């Protein structure tokens, strides 16, 4: 469906678009094209004003029940009015008088084509739309947006590129076309903070209708923004909640969905047209309950995120619109062109609000000499922070590959620099309290982080990024450090330049960058299980196909050996984490054990009942040899003796030397096997 967004329906960015109420005199002076724009108001008016409304007679005048109180009456017959009273907004007949809006209410019936609407209908739609506050103009003030979505406070002023009239038109045309949309834009143009808000607005106005050419029944469904991490769900939902003029979730168009969500973050009065911020796993449980699907951080290739893309593509007729948002298409453009049916590609040009300077610090050691390379890197980092120092009261972020490196680099820097040092990553509790210290300190703060800070938390006073250019890529029973991709570099660099000018200092040669195929270093059971649930054909229906298909087929055989029905698997997928696929054998044994095992997966609390149950699975590991690492840590070189990766080598750390065998409880807990 080719449909352009008329100017009067732009979302108010409170910069050059404001909420506005049009007068009948203004309508009289408009061109026919401008007048026809009001025909589209019939869709939001039917949904939000006329739904369950009826005709009443109020002081002798026929009106809609949403205009005035009165006794329900039979509607009058309507021909051409003999007189128009613009001041009273009424059509006058010889036998009766009817309000502009009531006239339109009676004329806008199912199957009526909107290009047939005459001036009389359009004037009534203008009045109904004014009451809903759905119109906008280039003149106005922020306070005019109060109440547009039931908000008590005005919308935020947003000068970002994604809310310009040009971008709004382009995004609307793609949304209403029902084609899959791939949206890119530089960090700082407002992809995640503004585009979901814009799609919420379009959904509020026009969502649920099969066409905008004529009046039909509608099926209202919310928008969902699917994200890879809980931290992102909380961050972005709070940002959009505030920018729409709300201070509380209840009654707002914003809802959150993630596992073990606290009571205070549940919207008890959600809107049918609203937007749900959800983790990928919970998005999959009710994927077809949503009209518009937005998948963010596509470049990360989160496993469940990639599965959602595959499922949505397979069942695209069950979703009205799908948006894939990513910082860059460097790694995925060609695959998306082939994989998605007739995709639309939108790029929002623009950059961060403030300039970012780049500084390259050369490491003279070759990365193949890993230990020497890292020691040189740490020396270079100290020099760089001394030369390129954040101002007092500001902060810098050091990006390293792993949690262990966070502690290693913090210890090294603390001995050599007089600044406040902090660590932030996904396993750190009470990040907000750390940020309070960062924001309140008059000193320079240096935050050492994993790739977690690429997107999960916005640091408002950061002015400098120190990027080591590496990431730890987990693999079954291990993992390795790799150099980052261009998209990861763009994300890290974009952490500055939002509030003040920034500096991006990088310590790696750009030639080292490469795309990361995460699927080649993942457990593949989720691909098998969700393929069964959603009737995907493997491997061709997968967004990213593993290089080694033998592992995919071995995983399928292993899952089949559990002798668990597809129906039971689907229930397990919807209710439990199953961080180890073998836990499924325990979840089906009894509700009491399932509850305790679920609690262990969520909180880490290991009861004796759960431990004994997991030990019964005999997840055996053979210890080949060991070596002393430091005071209370020994590195054990082992071989996996169970599952798809039987025979795979693994490295396990333990507080004392072991020989023989150990049993795996989780990816971090191991129990020595008693040799007696």
From Swiss-Prot:
Enzyme type, top EC level: hydrolase
MF (Gene Ontology): ATP binding; ATP hydrolysis activity; RNA binding; RNA helicase activity
UniProt keyword Transcription, yes or no: yes
Annotated binding of ATP, by residue: 185-192
Matches recorded under SUPFAM superfamilies: P-loop containing nucleoside triphosphate hydrolases (SSF52540)
The reaction(s) this protein catalyses: ATP + H2O = ADP + phosphate + H(+)
InterPro entries on file: DEAD/DEAH_box_helicase_dom, DNA/RNA_helicase_DEAH_CS, Helicase_ATP-bd, Helicase_C-like, NPH-II, P-loop_NTPase
Effect of residue 147 to A: In strain: Garcia-1966
Assembly with partners or alone: Monomer.
Name of this protein: RNA helicase NPH-II
Organism of provenance: Variola virus
Source species taxonomy: Viruses, Varidnaviria, Bamfordvirae, Nucleocytoviricota, Pokkesviricetes
């Amino acid at each position: 469906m080719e449909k352009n967004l008329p100017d009067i329906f732009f979302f108010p960015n409170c910069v050059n678009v404001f909420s506005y109420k049009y007068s009948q005199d203004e309508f009289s002076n408009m061109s026919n094209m401008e007048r026809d724009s009001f025909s589209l108001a019939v869709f939001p008016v039917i949904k939000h004003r006329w739904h369950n409304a009826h005709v009443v007679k109020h002081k002798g005048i026929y009106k809609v029940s949403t205009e005035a109180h009165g006794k329900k009456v039979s509607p009058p017959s309507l021909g051409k009015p003999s007189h128009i009273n613009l001041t009273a907004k009424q059509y006058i007949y010889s036998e009766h008088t009817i309000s502009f809006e009531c006239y339109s209410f009676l004329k806008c019936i199912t199957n009526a084509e909107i290009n047939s609407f005459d001036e009389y209908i359009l004037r009534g739609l203008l009045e109904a739309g004014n009451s809903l506050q759905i119109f906008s103009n280039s003149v106005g003030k922020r306070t005019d947006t109060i109440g547009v979505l039931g908000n008590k406070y005005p919308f935020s002023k947003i000068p970002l590129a994604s809310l310009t009239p040009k971008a709004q038109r382009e995004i609307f045309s793609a949304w209403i076309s029902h084609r899959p949309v791939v949206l890119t834009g530089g960090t700082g143009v407002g992809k995640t903070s503004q585009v979901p808000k814009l799609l919420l607005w379009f959904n509020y106005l026009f969502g649920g209708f099969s066409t905008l050419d004529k009046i039909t029944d509608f099926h209202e469904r919310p928008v969902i923004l699917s994200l890879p991490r809980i931290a992102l769900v909380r961050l972005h939902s709070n940002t959009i909640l505030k920018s729409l003029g709300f201070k509380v979730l209840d009654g707002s168009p914003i809802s959150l969905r993630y596992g073990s969500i606290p009571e205070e973050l549940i919207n008890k009065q959600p809107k049918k047209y609203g937007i749900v911020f959800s983790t990928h796993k919970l998005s999959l449980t009710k994927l077809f309950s949503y009209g518009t699907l937005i998948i963010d951080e596509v470049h990360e290739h989160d496993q469940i995120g990639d599965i959602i893309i595959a499922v949505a593509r397979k069942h695209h007729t069950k979703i009205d619109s799908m948006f894939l948002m990513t910082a860059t298409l460097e790694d995925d453009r060609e695959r998306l062109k082939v994989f998605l049916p007739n995709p639309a590609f939108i790029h929002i040009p623009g950059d961060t609000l403030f300039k970012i300077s780049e500084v390259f610090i050369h490491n003279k050691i070759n990365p193949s000499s890993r230990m020497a390379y890292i020691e040189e890197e740490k020396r270079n980092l100290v020099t760089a922070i001394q030369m390129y120092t954040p101002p007092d009261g500001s902060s810098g972020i050091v990006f390293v590959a792993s949690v262990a490196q966070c502690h290693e680099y913090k210890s090294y820097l603390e001995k050599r620099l007089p600044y406040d040092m902090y660590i932030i990553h996904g396993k750190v509790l009470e990040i907000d309290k750390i940020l309070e210290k960062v924001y309140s300190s008059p000193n320079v703060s240096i935050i050492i982080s994993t790739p977690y800070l690429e997107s999960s938390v916005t640091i408002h006073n950061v002015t400098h990024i120190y990027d080591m250019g590496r990431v730890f890529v987990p693999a079954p029973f291990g993992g390795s450090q790799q150099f980052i991709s261009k998209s990861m570099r763009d994300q890290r660099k974009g952490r500055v330049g939002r509030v003040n000018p920034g500096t991006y200092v990088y310590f790696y040669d750009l030639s080292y960058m490469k795309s990361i195929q995460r699927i080649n270093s993942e457990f593949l059971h989720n691909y098998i299980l969700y393929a069964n649930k959603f009737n995907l054909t493997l491997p061709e229906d997968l967004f990213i196909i593993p290089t080694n298909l033998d592992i995919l087929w071995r995983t399928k055989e292993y899952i089949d050996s559990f002798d668990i029905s597809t129906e039971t698997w689907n229930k397990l997928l919807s209710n439990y984490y199953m961080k180890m696929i073998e836990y499924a054998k325990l979840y089906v044994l009894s509700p009491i054990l399932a509850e305790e095992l679920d609690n262990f997966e969520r909180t880490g609390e290991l009861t004796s009942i759960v431990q004994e149950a997991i030990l019964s699975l005999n997840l055996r590991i053979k210890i080949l040899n060991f070596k002393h690492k430091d005071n209370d840590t020994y590195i054990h070189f082992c071989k996996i003796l169970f599952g798809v990766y039987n025979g795979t080598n693994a490295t396990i750390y333990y507080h004392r030397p072991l020989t023989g065998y150990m049993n795996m409880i989780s990816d971090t807990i191991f129990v020595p096997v008693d040799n007696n």
